[in-house]
Amino acid sequence: MILELPKFATVEQVAAIRNGVRPFLPEVKIPTYNRDGKSVFISKTPALQTVDVLVATLMDKLQAEVVQHRYKPMFNSGDSGYEYHLYAPGQICHYHTDGEVAQGVLRYATVILFLTDNEGGELVFPTQNKEVKPEAGKIVVFPPYGTHGHYTKPSKTNREILMTWFVYDGIKVSGVAQ
């Protein structure tokens, strides 16, 4: 199930996230296995605590209003921290699945918050025959499993997103190839 929640974040919240994070973008791209562009891990950047709290408030609302009812997690859960990503024109996120287990924790939902309106840059789920248009403030929630492989199309303008994963609290997975 792929959920689209238009205008979940307000124009003001989106602007606060974008303006808060941009000064912390690295000068050069730090290699990641499936994404072009530049990233900032908000939750691991002490100077971004205000942005981290703002995003946490949005994710708490998402958890309470949507995720708890749609995904019905079996255990206490929370998110895994927040990653901001900037794609320059023509850059993409390559086809991949997010994976159910990462860094020893069990994921059950992927969350993407679009921070810009774009022509192009659609989030594509080929197996589900679904494309999601980037619209500032829209949240997309989907399973991290192999059933929901995805990629993005290139955009003609800068595209900005924020990502997190909902994970089970206190449940550690060991002995699994990651």
Segments (PLM) and residue ranges:
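Non-heme Fe(II)/2-oxoglutarate
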Residues: 1-76
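Non-heme Fe(II) oxygenase catalytic core, chiefly the N-lobe of the double-stranded beta-helix
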Residues: 19, 67-104
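Short, conserved beta-strand element in jelly-roll/cupin
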Residues: 84-86, 101-119, 166
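Catalytic core of Fe(II)/2-oxoglutarate
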Residues: 107, 118-178
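A generic fold-level signal
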Residues: 9, 76-79, 103-107, 134, ...
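Short beta-strand segments enriched in hydrophobic/aromatic residues
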Residues: 9, 21, 99, 115, ...
